[in-house]
Regions:
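The conserved SAM/SAH-binding core of class I Rossmann-like methyltransferase domains
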Residues: 12, 39, 82
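Short, Lys/Arg-enriched N-terminal segments with co-localized hydrophobic residues
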Residues: 1-3
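FMN-binding flavodoxin-like domain, especially the glycine-rich phosphate-binding loop
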Residues: 5-7, 30-34, 49-54, 59-170
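Short acidic low-complexity segments
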Residues: 37-48
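N-terminal beta1-alpha1 ligand-phosphate binding loop
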Residues: 5-30
Length: 170
């Protein structure tokens, strides 16, 4: 097992609604500050650190475009993936997303950890579902989508962040 306390690291993230930034903050608070080479948003610059914590938001079952671009440029890095998705409640769903994301990672890299949790969505999403329900021939699963939206409102919560911190500590 490599020692994450001794190695220099960078934390790069894309966060559309602030959910993934919460995860990034939790990682930053957990690791030794003096070993941090970079903490901030992903501007697609390849970090110098050997260890990279890469955070994304989910877009159509994969990481956002900016994150995928960065991942495809990384070589010989130790990568810890973390992300949020509006739809939650199923580890299998998160596994599927992470599987997609990992296809953009070069074989010279090692994925040393991965974590995903649900993240709240903008109110406009719920409003759209409610509007769609008013149509006579609406999708049958709208009630489920609205229930999922409401469940997501509290996430990432303390439990989500604690679980991530535990993984990062190793």
């Amino acid at each position: 097992v490599w020692d994450m306390i001794k190695e220099h690291y960078s934390i790069l993230f894309c966060s559309l609604t602030g959910n993934t930034k919460k995860l990034a903050d939790a990682i930053y608070e957990t690791l030794p500050k003096d070993k941090c080479d970079y903490f901030g948003t992903n501007d697609s610059q390849v970090p110098q650190s050997d260890v990279c914590y890469i955070g994304f938001w989910t877009d159509k079952g994969n990481a956002d475009q900016k994150t995928l671009e960065l991942l495809s440029k990384l070589k010989n890095k130790k990568i810890f993936l973390f992300g949020t998705a509006g739809f939650g409640g199923s580890d299998a769903y998160f596994e599927k997303i992470l599987g997609q994301v990992k296809q953009s990672i070069d074989a010279s890299n090692t994925v040393i950890g991965e974590y995903m949790c649900q993240g709240k969505m903008p109110q406009a999403v719920r409003d759209r579902y409610v509007k769609m329900k008013e149509q006579p021939d609406h999708m049958p699963n709208l009630d489920l989508l609205i229930a999922n939206f409401d469940r997501a409102l509290s996430h990432p919560d303390k439990k989500d962040l604690d679980k991530l911190r535990e993984l990062v500590r190793g």
